[in-house]
């Protein structure tokens, strides 16, 4: 019996270990800076003020429109959610069966073992009730800034950006990652854009080290709060 319990405990630990989110690592190729696909033309020294290949509209600002350009995203994320749910189910059933004859004849109800006469009557009654309540509240706030690079410019002018920032502290590392789509019109003259203007945003804030480990429950605690716990 003890051996069987040990096997179940080991199997549960393995399953819970597989459910743990992987630890983020730096230098992810997906978030690496994207370099321009074509090099800029070399400046020709021909004595002229205007050079071919270098132009800037006098009535437009110099914004990041090309692959490899840099954009600063201002993080100002605030989300809150709450949910209440309740359910109550009750059922009462009662059945009475009274028989005076069986197949057209009255059976002998004398008790051969003594005592009172036997009876063909039967009855059943039962009550069942289920009640449950749940409540969940969650809120998140993320402020700051992160500078990313232009990864792709779509034919309709939408700009795909992504990048990451790692902060190495004495107790671990802090990570901020973001990827999404930005309209060129939403980019300010200083090449900044608020995170609320980033479409299909994928924002990650995580970390490693003792502080991050302290906020994570142990494998046995995860078992008791997981759907595998039968009670």
Curated annotation (Swiss-Prot):
Q: Which Pfam families match?
A: FlgH
What membrane topology does the annotation report for this chain? Lipid-anchor
Q: Name one GO molecular function term.
A: cytoskeletal motor activity
Name the keywords, alphabetized: Bacterial flagellum, Cell outer membrane, Lipoprotein, Membrane, Palmitate, Signal
| Any one Gene Ontology BP term | bacterial-type flagellum-dependent cell motility
| Lipid sites, type S-diacylglycerol cysteine | 19
Domain of life here?
Bacteria
Instruction: Tell me which residues bear the N-palmitoyl cysteine lipid modification.
Output: 19
Kindly report the protein's main subcellular placement as a broad class: membrane
What GO CC annotations are associated with the protein? bacterial-type flagellum basal body, distal rod, L ring; cell outer membrane
Its signal peptide is 1-18
> What is the annotated localization of this protein?
Cell outer membrane; Bacterial flagellum basal body
- Please give the subunit comment from the record: The basal body constitutes a major portion of the flagellar organelle and consists of four rings (L,P,S, and M) mounted on a central rod.
Function, in words: Assembles around the rod to form the L-ring and probably protects the motor/basal body from shearing forces during rotation.
| Sequence similarity | Belongs to the FlgH family.
State what protein this is by name: Flagellar L-ring protein
* Native organism: Pseudomonas putida (strain ATCC 47054 / DSM 6125 / CFBP 8728 / NCIMB 11950 / KT2440)
